[in-house]
Design a protein with these regions (language model features):
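Substrate-binding cleft of secreted/luminal carbohydrate-active enzymes
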Residues: 1, 53-58, 62-63, 168-169, ...
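Generic structural signal for short, solvent-exposed loop/turn connectors between secondary structure elements
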Residues: 1-11, 96-109, 162-168
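Aromatic-lined substrate-binding rim segments of carbohydrate-active enzymes
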Residues: 1-51, 111-127, 153, 171-174
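Substrate-binding cleft/loops of secretory-pathway carbohydrate-active enzymes
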Residues: 2-3, 67-71, 134-171
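Hydrophobic faces of well-ordered beta-strands that scaffold small-molecule active sites
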Residues: 7-11, 57-61, 133-136, 156-160, ...
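Polysaccharide-binding and catalytic clefts of secreted carbohydrate-active enzymes
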Residues: 26-30, 52-148
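Glycan-recognition surfaces
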Residues: 83-96, 156-170, 175
Length: 175
């Protein structure tokens, strides 16, 4: 079938999809070298088998990720706050706090996004330089501007999952 019909392939960069069951959902330290090795391994496993397929349009990244919303009382910020100060992400978090003492903590999401998207782009392009990177599928109600701005240098497009029954023309015009 993959040789007869155009298709896209999803790559879940971090298991923070809104629809994932609790036992598969979780934040990761995107600054940790172990996470980065796993990310590269997962991207390679998905990309290499199909990189020569002419029917492949491109790759989507994490589907409907939680960026500002919490899940079971945890979100990106509380996750980084909980990391040991000497862990890779703990050091980045502490340095960011020191450099931005009066900034809203949610601004740190841009730092997470930049790291995640830069690493994912480099890995994907290493294994497949030819197909589109369609980026993450953002949820209309959880796509912070500062996160979206960080993805733009690393993708060819982004996708947005609408949340209302009626098409939100004003929202999409603004985007």
């Amino acid at each position: 079938m993959w040789e007869r019909f155009p298709y896209t392939k999803g790559i879940n960069l971090v298991p923070i999809c809104q629809w994932l069951p609790d036992d598969r959902y979780g934040y990761r330290d995107v600054f940790d070298s172990e996470f980065l090795r796993e990310l590269d391994k997962n991207i390679r496993a998905i990309v290499e088998p199909q990189k020569e397929n002419r029917m492949l349009i491109g790759y989507f990244w994490t589907d409907i990720a939680n960026w500002e919303r919490d899940r079971n009382g945890e979100d990106w910020i509380s996750f980084y706050q909980s990391l040991p100060a000497d862990s890779p992400g703990g050091r980045v978090w502490q340095q960011w706090l020191s450099d931005h003492p009066s900034a809203p903590h949610g601004d740190f999401l841009a730092v997470i996004a930049r790291q995640l998207y830069a690493e994912a782009n480099a890995s994907l392009r290493n294994y497949d330089p030819n197909h589109l990177i369609l980026g993450p599928r953002y949820h209309e109600i959880d796509m912070p501007d500062h996160v979206v701005r960080e993805v733009l240098p690393y993708v060819d497009a982004i996708a947005i999952q609408p949340t209302s029954r009626e098409f939100n023309t004003a929202f999409f015009d603004e985007v």
